[in-house]
């Protein structure tokens, strides 16, 4: 999936579970990460910085683990 700044995305749970990123993080991610609409605010290599519409810090996620939200 080609993403660009401003795109709305969500994290695909099946692609995230078992990944290196999941192993390095708290396994109990909040539901809004998988069901919500995060906005891509920056890109660096194979990662996208995503801002979710809740009062939490932005998070870096692998682009291949993201899915566009319509």
Swiss-Prot record:
Subcellular location: Cellular thylakoid membrane
Pfam families recorded: NdhO (PF11910)
Annotated keywords: Membrane, NAD, NADP, Plastoquinone, Quinone, Thylakoid, Translocase, Transport
Predominant subcellular localization, coarse grouping: membrane
InterPro entries from the UniProt entry: NdhO
Catalyzed reaction equations: a plastoquinone + NADH + (n+1) H(+)(in) = a plastoquinol + NAD(+) + n H(+)(out); a plastoquinone + NADPH + (n+1) H(+)(in) = a plastoquinol + NADP(+) + n H(+)(out)
Top-rank lineage group of the source organism: Bacteria
Entry EC number(s): 7.1.1.-
GO terms assigned for molecular function: oxidoreductase activity, acting on NAD(P)H, quinone or similar compound as acceptor; quinone binding
GO annotation, cellular component aspect: plasma membrane-derived thylakoid membrane
Topology of the protein relative to the lipid bilayer: Peripheral membrane protein
Alphabetized HAMAP family for the sequence: NDH1_NDH1O
Function: NDH-1 shuttles electrons from an unknown electron donor, via FMN and iron-sulfur (Fe-S) centers, to quinones in the respiratory and/or the photosynthetic chain. The immediate electron acceptor for the enzyme in this species is believed to be plastoquinone. Couples the redox reaction to proton translocation, and thus conserves the redox energy in a proton gradient. Cyanobacterial NDH-1 also plays a role in inorganic carbon-concentration.
Subunit architecture: NDH-1 can be composed of about 15 different subunits; different subcomplexes with different compositions have been identified which probably have different functions.
Family label: Belongs to the complex I NdhO subunit family.
Full protein name: NAD(P)H-quinone oxidoreductase subunit O
Organism of derivation: Cyanothece sp. (strain PCC 7425 / ATCC 29141)
Gene giving rise to this polypeptide: ndhO
């Amino acid at each position: 999936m080609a993403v660009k700044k401003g795109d709305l995305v969500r994290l695909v749970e099946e692609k995230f579970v078992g990944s290196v990123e999941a192993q390095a993080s708290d396994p109990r991610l909040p539901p809004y990460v998988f069901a919500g609409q995060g906005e891509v605010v920056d890109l660096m290599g194979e990662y996208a910085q995503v801002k979710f519409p809740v009062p939490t810090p932005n998070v870096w996620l692998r682009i291949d683990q993201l899915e566009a939200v319509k």
